[in-house]
């Protein structure tokens, strides 16, 4: 029987003078008048953002959003920090080995300014918690573990039922690339993208299907045999430590563009399309179709 984890709730005291002083450097890029700048910043301030998975990308995004002026977060992650996380994850350290990732990230985020509201789901996203986590969110980021299927489907179903949540991002790093998968109420649902039953066991065939659908493009190096060894044999996703900060920047920028409605931002393709930035070849592109059907 699983131990029931207690949820931590942070409720900060809002100080208007402190808030506007701490986000002051944002404002010059947000409008042509002080009124326009503040109205756009207020959209970010008042948004409720859910981050499902607070590892290498999600944890860093949570802290960046607080610095940018977001005041309302919901964080979920069932995992505990281990030694291998120190290579890339915000909050991972020898001191925090064995501690819940969402709890550590929430603690760090709250300590930055103490004027924010954070709900922590240390049990992560489950069939039972998905709708409660989604409730009240304007945007949700799916940064859950690569091998999650059933609970990921539950989160996406909760999104499609939500009247408030506008869209979801799923942004994995693959080698030296960052992929941006966008889900809306009208996009292809993730169950159709994956084409895997929610109760499927993680067999080599299922793992290869996940690789195909989450990693649309791969470089020739390293070879497929080595990737199969990691993903299929060891059931572990390799992540190059320099890449999560790239994903963090892209993710936070896209969130800001959408939430603040910054003039000039383009709409990225929704699933089954995607956007990708590759730091190895220094290229970026938009893909508008189901890549696996080619």
Task: Label every model-predicted segment.
Residues 1-50, 270:
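N-terminal charged helix/coil linker that caps or initiates catalytic domains
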Residues 57-58:
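Hydrophobic/small residue at the entry helix of a nucleotide-binding pocket
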Residues 67-72:
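Conserved S-adenosyl-L-methionine
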């Amino acid at each position: 029987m699983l131990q029931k984890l207690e949820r931590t709730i942070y409720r900060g005291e809002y100080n208007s003078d402190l808030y506007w002083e701490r986000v002051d450097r944002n404002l010059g890029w947000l409008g042509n008048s002080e009124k326009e700048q503040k109205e756009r910043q207020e959209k970010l301030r008042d948004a409720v953002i859910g981050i499902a998975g607070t590892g290498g990308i999600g944890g860093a995004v949570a802290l960046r959003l607080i610095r940018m002026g977001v005041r309302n977060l919901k964080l979920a992650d069932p995992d505990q920090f281990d030694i291998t996380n120190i290579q890339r994850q915000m909050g991972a350290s020898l001191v925090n080995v064995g501690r819940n990732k969402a709890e550590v990230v929430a603690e760090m985020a709250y300590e930055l300014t103490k004027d924010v509201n954070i709900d922590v789901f240390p049990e992560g996203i489950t069939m039972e918690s998905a709708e409660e986590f989604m409730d009240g969110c304007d945007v949700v980021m799916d940064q859950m573990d690569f091998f999650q299927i059933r609970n990921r489907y539950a989160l996406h179903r909760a999104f499609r039922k939500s009247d408030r949540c506008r869209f979801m991002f799923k942004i994995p790093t693959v080698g030296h690339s960052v992929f941006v998968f966008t889900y809306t109420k009208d996009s292809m649902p993730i169950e159709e993208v994956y084409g895997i039953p929610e109760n499927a066991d993680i067999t080599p065939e299922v793992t290869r299907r996940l690789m195909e659908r989450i990693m649309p493009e791969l470089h020739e190096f390293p070879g497929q045999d080595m990737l199969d060894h990691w993903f299929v044999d060891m059931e572990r996703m390799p992540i190059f430590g320099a890449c999560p900060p790239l994903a963090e920047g892209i993710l936070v920028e896209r969130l800001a563009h959408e939430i603040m409605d910054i003039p000039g931002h383009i709409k990225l393709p929704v699933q089954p399309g995607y956007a990708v930035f590759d730091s190895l070849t220094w290229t970026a592109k938009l893909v508008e179709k189901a890549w696996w059907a080619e």
